[in-house]
Design a protein with these regions (language model features):
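Soluble non-cytosolic domains of exported or imported proteins
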Residues: 66-70, 85, 139, 143-144, ...
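Short, low-complexity disordered leader/linker segments with a strong preference
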Residues: 1-30, 328-331
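Conserved C-terminal helix/tail region of periplasmic/extracytoplasmic solute-binding proteins
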Residues: 300-331
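Pocket-lining segment of extracytoplasmic ligand-binding domains
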Residues: 90, 171-265
Length: 331
């Protein structure tokens, strides 16, 4: 009789363990994330992946390159991805087109512009006035890099339409090659291209647009309003993983961050990754928490308006959900 009881207890224990394992396995949720480009600028996202923060939250991330704001929004709206990492201006463009299921910003990743002004010639004692009369190779019209670029130029008394020759009809992927081939006196470049050009003697970094622009929701995680309603717990877990990564990046050295994200940039030397991370950390480009506040939102719309690209003024609470981020931070 005792043997039978022991067998029953053993069997019940086995069933319980098996059930818990099966339950845990079923809780893993796959989330498709589309990133507008693949960049060291998004270091906290890769830290969340490499340090296992998404895994801790029971999320399996399918990271896809959607390359370009328009393509990223198309993928999100057509359910090709669940969450987009892209500039917040895209959510305003979609809203202005009368979207019945608007795109909601729920977790901010970067809070400054990520581009740098690179001069073909070495410049001593650089001043923004030196751009007057020059040829400036800018970014795509309507995108955040170009709008911030124009905002900063105007801030320093340089009219991008009349004080210089502004070239902005070159595809994003070809801008660096165009400058290397001899087009333009100045160019607006992301890292690590800016540092590579400096190392190779093709250009010289003379200013940071990120330092000059102030805080803006430059790159944000967003999704459709319906997805948040139907998958609120998933969005909360996702935001929690990002916040863990943001705190990790803030408290670790550029070298440690570089080592963590190196597997996602196999073609980039580790010392260059470290240089880029240090530059972005130094100028406060990485958001330290996922909250997109009203001041940043209004700054974004001011920049868009100055560039003539703001289709309609949108209140912060309409396209930004801070409840999830605030809840995660308060835990």
């Amino acid at each position: 009789m005792r043997l039978i009881k022991s067998s029953i207890v053993l069997f019940a224990t086995f069933i319980l363990i098996f059930s818990l394992a099966a339950c845990g396995k079923s809780e893993v949720q796959k989330v498709r994330v589309g990133e507008v480009t693949h960049s060291i600028f998004y270091a906290p996202q890769y830290v969340a992946l490499s340090e296992g923060f998404f895994e801790e939250e029971g999320l399996e991330i399918d990271l896809q390159g959607t390359f370009g704001g328009d393509k990223t929004m198309t993928a999100l709206l057509s359910d090709g991805i669940d969450i987009a990492l892209v500039g917040s201006e895209t959510s305003i463009y979609v809203y202005a087109q009368g979207a019945t299921d608007p795109v909601i910003n729920f977790a901010q990743l970067t809070q400054t512009d990520g581009t740098f002004l690179v001069s073909r010639e070495k410049v001593e004692n650089f001043s923004w006035d030196q751009l007057k009369g020059s040829t400036f190779l800018g970014q795509r019209k309507g995108g955040m890099p170009q709008m911030v670029g124009e905002f900063v130029l105007n801030k320093h008394g340089v009219d991008p339409q009349t004080d210089l020759e502004l070239i902005q009809n070159i595809e994003f992927a070809n801008i660096a090659n165009a400058f290397a081939s001899g087009t333009g006196d100045y160019v607006q470049l992301f890292e690590p291209t800016a540092s590579i050009f400096e190392q190779e003697g093709k250009g010289h970094i003379v200013a940071s647009f990120g330092k000059e622009s102030g805080h803006v929701p430059y790159t944000t995680f967003m999704t459709k309003e319906s997805y948040i309603k139907e998958n609120k717990e998933v969005v909360e877990k996702f935001t929690r993983a990002i916040y863990k990564a943001q705190k990790w990046v803030e408290t670790h050295s550029a070298k440690e961050v570089a080592e963590s994200i190196a597997p996602y940039f196999e073609d980039t030397p580790i010392d260059l990754i470290e240089t880029v991370v240090e530059r972005y950390k130094e100028q406060g480009s990485f958001a330290t928490d996922p909250i997109l506040d009203e001041e940043e939102w209004n700054n974004l719309q001011t920049i868009m308006d100055d560039a003539g690209e703001l289709p309609t003024d949108v209140e912060h609470g309409i396209l930004v959900n801070t409840d999830i981020a605030e809840s995660v931070i308060s835990e």
